[in-house]
């Protein structure tokens, strides 16, 4: 049982902003109804649905008619051109009137008592960016499956989001794991709450990023490096439908088919200092790609007096393996009688353990890079 302290209602009115693009109407309305039905009325100032240029006919007039039942509590904003998830989220947050903004994907279900633990933590620490425990909703049966805070958010050097087990240091720090916030280096990015003023003070989202991808790691690194914290709150649960792929067009301006890559380069150039070299090991094709003006984000980092990325690695995620540091060897494993090297054959690093093959050596290619290090009396090879 979770016992909540009283939260002054006027001090913590929230605005909730589900962003959607051609979402299934029943799934979208499940999200909206669950938030309204399971949130104390004095805490929920508004629900603002941000429609990022949907084309589904049932998200037109039928949606407007359905939302009338909520009166002024629910508003609908429509973009007349495609903004993309990142800029649409920024637009919603700027439109907000509540003290706290809550971002939940449009395919969620808020559980009982989901909001109060998030607000309580923000009330205690204004610079805390807080996430609920994300439960699974089956994309086949729509069944809600309750879970727990069993891991933390991390990242691959290719700048894809990943998760890992809770480290021992964090287990020791938390006296009551059923209640105490879980510090997490990164977040998935679809479900979190933040003080609205703090969100913009620390830089909001990078408006130079297109559509989707990379924004979750960018805000994660930035919050930690600039004095905030990123936390998972065990008492707060929200269900989420994990979908296979994206149901909408992911092509960016100029027919850019790799918005995740170009967004990640913006992140690497501004926030990762010399460690951006490890990103380019995986994405060497992006080295000479123009990703727009970075001057405003660089000035933001200077203005906030943010710490270095090495500080982030040493203090927030010390378990993170740095491939070219503290190892016995780093480079290619080549057959001396030929030009073949050990290679992952383009199997992605974020898919777990992969079987190695051989391929023509690629001096700058991530798939041919091998790390050798000692583990007790044995020698291990890590791709």
Locate predicted features.
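Conserved donor NDP-sugar-binding/catalytic core segment of glycosyltransferases
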Residues: 109, 113-165, 229
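A short, conserved alpha-helix in the catalytic core of glycosyltransferases
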Residues: 117-118, 186, 190-192, 197-203, ...
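Acidic donor-binding segment of Leloir-type glycosyltransferases
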Residues: 36-78
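Glycine-rich, basic loop-to-helix element that forms the pyrophosphate-binding segment
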Residues: 80-96
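Lectin-like carbohydrate-binding module/patch detector with strong preference for beta-trefoil
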Residues: 319-383
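Short aromatic/hydrophobic "clamp" motif used to bind/position activated sugar donors
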Residues: 101
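N-proximal low-complexity "stem/linker" segments adjacent to membrane-targeting elements
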Residues: 1-37
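A recurrent flexible, glycine/aromatic-enriched loop bordering the glycosyltransferase active site
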Residues: 86, 160-193
């Amino acid at each position: 049982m979770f016992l909540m302290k009283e939260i002054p209602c006027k001090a913590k009115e929230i605005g909730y902003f589900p962003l959607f693009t051609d979402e299934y109407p029943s799934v979208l309305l499940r999200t909206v109804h669950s938030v309204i039905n399971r949130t104390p009325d004095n805490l929920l100032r508004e629900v603002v649905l941000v429609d990022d240029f949907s084309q589904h006919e049932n998200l037109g007039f039928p949606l407007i008619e359905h939302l009338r039942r909520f009166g002024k509590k629910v508003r609908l904003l429509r973009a007349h051109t495609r903004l993309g998830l990142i800029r649409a989220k920024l637009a919603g947050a700027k439109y907000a009137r509540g003290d706290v903004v809550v971002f939940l994907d449009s395919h969620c279900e808020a559980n009982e008592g989901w909001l109060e633990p998030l607000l309580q933590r923000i009330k205690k620490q204004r610079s805390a960016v807080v996430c609920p425990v994300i439960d699974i909703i089956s994309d086949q049966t729509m069944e809600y499956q309750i879970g727990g805070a069993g891991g933390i958010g991390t990242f691959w050097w290719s700048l894809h989001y990943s998760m890992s087990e809770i480290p021992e240091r964090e287990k020791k720090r938390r006296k009551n794991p059923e209640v105490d916030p879980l510090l997490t280096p990164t977040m998935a990015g679809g479900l979190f709450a933040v003080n609205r003023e703090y969100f913009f003070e620390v830089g909001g989202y990078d408006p130079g990023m297109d559509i989707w991808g990379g924004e979750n790691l960018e805000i994660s690194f930035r919050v930690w490096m600039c004095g905030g914290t990123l936390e998972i709150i065990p008492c707060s649960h929200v269900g989420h439908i994990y979908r296979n792929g994206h149901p909408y067009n992911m092509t960016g301006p100029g027919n850019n088919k790799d918005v995740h890559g170009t967004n990640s380069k913006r992140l690497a150039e501004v926030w990762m200092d010399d460690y951006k070299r490890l990103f380019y090991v995986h994405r060497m094709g992006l080295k000479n790609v123009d990703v727009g003006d970075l001057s405003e984000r660089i000035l933001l980092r200077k203005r906030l007096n943010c710490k270095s990325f090495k500080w982030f690695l040493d203090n927030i995620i010390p378990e993170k393996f740095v491939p070219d540091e503290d190892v016995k060897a780093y480079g290619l494993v080549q057959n001396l009688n030929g030009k073949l090297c050990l290679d992952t054959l383009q199997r992605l690093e974020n898919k777990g353990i992969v079987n190695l093959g051989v391929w023509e050596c690629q001096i700058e290619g991530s798939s041919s890079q091998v790390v050798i290090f000692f583990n007790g009396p044995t020698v291990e090879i890590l791709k």
